[in-house]
């Protein structure tokens, strides 16, 4: 059984915004609609998405590289390091992406580290409407180190 640890999210969240090309307009409209709420938080985004959000809203955005150029992996690393609290990722389920493995890895990391994740506008709307969005919150994160050690030992014995 894995142990859990508590990770505190402050009232001012670190929110990362990502959108595939066909969903960038949808995300920008969502950000504009929620601008009064989002201005109370710190925004991050992958390259092109961040540029569009910043230009379209005048909200400050810390930008990573473009998704296909490693931005999704940068975001995943920041999630694993506990530096990002919320993922808003409007992805296109009907359009194959050249960096699909990176997208899958990012979503896996978001689940593994138990960060709130919205992949469509309805979920993002519910998220920002939640009272938890505006208060500090402690999320539970499983400690997988024991399971990893057990796996590595079993692999060593199998050799």
Mark where each language-model region is.
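Mid-chain, well-packed structural core segment of small domains
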Residues: 72-112
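Short, glycine-/small-residue-rich phosphate/pyrophosphate-handling segment
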Residues: 122-155
């Amino acid at each position: 059984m894995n142990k859990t640890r508590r990770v505190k999210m402050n009232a001012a969240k670190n929110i990362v915004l990502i959108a595939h090309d066909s969903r960038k307009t949808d995300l920008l409209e969502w950000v504009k609609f929620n601008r009064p709420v989002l201005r109370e938080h710190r925004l991050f985004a992958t390259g092109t998405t961040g540029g569009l959000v910043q230009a379209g809203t005048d909200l400050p955005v810390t930008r990573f590289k473009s998704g296909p150029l490693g931005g999704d992996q940068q975001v995943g690393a920041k999630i694993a390091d506990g530096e990002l609290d919320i993922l808003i990722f409007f992805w296109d389920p009907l359009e194959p992406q050249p960096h699909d493995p990176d997208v899958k890895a990012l979503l896996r990391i978001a689940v593994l580290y138990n960060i709130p994740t919205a992949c469509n506008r309805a979920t993002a709307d519910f998220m920002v409407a939640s009272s938890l969005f505006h208060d500090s919150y402690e999320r539970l994160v499983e400690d997988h180190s024991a399971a990893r050690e057990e796996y590595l030992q079993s692999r060593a014995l199998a050799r």
